[in-house]
Amino acid sequence: MAGDVEGGGCRVSWGALLTLLLLPLPSLCTLASGKEPHVIKLYEGKVVRYNESKNFCYQRTYEPKWSDVWTKIQIRVNSTKMIRVTQVENEEKLKEMETFNMFDLFSSFLKEKLNDTFIYVDLYSNKTCIKVHVIDTDTYYSVALSRGFDPRLCFLFLCGLLLFFYGDALSRSQLFFYSTGITIGMLASMLILVFMLSKLMPKKSPFVALLLGGWSVSIYIIQLVFKNLQAICSEYWQYLLGYLGIVGFVSFAFCYKYGPLENDRSINILTWTLQLIGLLLMYISVQIQHIAVTMVVIAFCTKQIEYPVQWIYILYRKIKRKRAKPSPPRLLTEEEYRKQGEIETRKALEELRGYCSSPDFATWKMISRIQSPKRFADFVEGSSHLTPNEVSVHEHEYGLGGSFLEDELFGEDSDIEVEMDIEQPLYLVPRSCF
């Protein structure tokens, strides 16, 4: 019983101690909430310098125009030592920060401390406030507000256009596949390592909680690396090159093992993903919201109109081709006809010799059917397919001064067209040779 009483007394004492510790908090919150925070107004082009913790606010004084599509407004806080900068929406949030809050107190210790901070302000934000907390008393800092053209926004917009209109071609490109895989491997190597470890761990292992925390730690480290990229490149460039080389090779080997996409459905999914990313980049790169929506809609309609325009153009060409009168073919001259006949006849004779010399040709069967086997054999060996007597008869009948020409010139029915190929006896193989 005494032990229970002592245990109970111990519990009562701990509860009383906790009550005594928490009792001052409401009074502190009340005192802090009744005190209005001192706020310093920020103006474009004006630089202010202080050496103690202050609150600053910027209030929008003009409406954004169409010329501000790639305009940025940023607040730069530069200090001699490490400081902590917190961004809030208005003075009310600053007033809430002045109150005592265990969560805010804990999160303030987790906030990153920098000596050069950039805060980007939305063009449509009516008011933006920051709180600069000085850690060391001998710290001096300056706060400047600037507005101007941001080339990075323009670059993002062009990248969005490229991804949206050329997503199909990029999804089928091997160069894009390997370059994207290597880049993702370099940027997200820690995330990939955590993912691979999670596959090796059992699902009910206590390390799952550690891995879940590892994702957030990895993202935090990546943000920290990007913020200090210039210092890392100048001081630790040897380690950076080694890291990029090893991770790049591993990423390339991984991509080479699985190879580019070949399935049409996978390619379509990648194409749609690239197009959605392109539309998202186009939207976030334009600061004027209604102009951003208009550009996204125009790009989408232009991409979809591409196919109907092609169909209309093909239909127009077919209709035009049907309505157009066929142009009469150009007739050959006598010299062109003679040359074409010689070329085609020589080509046909060579094909016939090749066929007769092939193993598929039934030689004995053909010899049994022709009248002059020796003439056929001479023809296959390369001799002419016409005898001198046949050439002489052809020249006598169809040459200059021949009977055919006299009938054409002096015949009574010379105005009637006679369908006769005058060069045919010269080029065709006589039937008598087979």
Curated annotation (Swiss-Prot):
Post-translation changes: Phosphorylated.
Annotated signal sequence range: 1-34
Keywords: Developmental protein, Erythrocyte maturation, Membrane, Nucleus, Signal, Transmembrane, Transmembrane helix
Subcellular location: Nucleus inner membrane; Nucleus envelope
Sequence segments annotated as region (B): 326-395
Stretch list, region Interaction with banf1-a and banf1-b: 326-434
Transmembrane segments: 151-171, 175-195, 206-226, 236-256, 280-300
A GO BP entry: eye development
Extent of motif Nuclear localization signal: 317-325
Knockout consequences: Morpholino knockdown results in defects in eye development, reduced expression of early eye marker genes rax, tbx3, six3 and pax6 and reduction of cell density at the neurula stage. Co-knockdown of nemp1a and ran elicits reduction of cell density and eye defects more significantly than the individual knockdown of either one.
Keyword set includes Flavoprotein: no
Keyword Oxidoreductase in annotation: no
Region (BAF-binding site (BBS)): 368-375
Subunit details: Homooligomer. Interacts with banf1-a and banf1-b. Interacts with ran-gtp.
Job of this protein: In concert with ran, required for proper eye development. May be involved in the expression of early eye marker genes. Contributes to nuclear envelope stiffness in germ cells. Required for fertility. Essential for normal erythropoiesis. Required for efficient nuclear envelope opening and enucleation during the late stages of erythroblast maturation.
Family the entry assigns: Belongs to the NEMP family.
Free-text comment about domains: The transmembrane domains are required and sufficient for its oligomerization.
Protein's UniProt name: Nuclear envelope integral membrane protein 1a
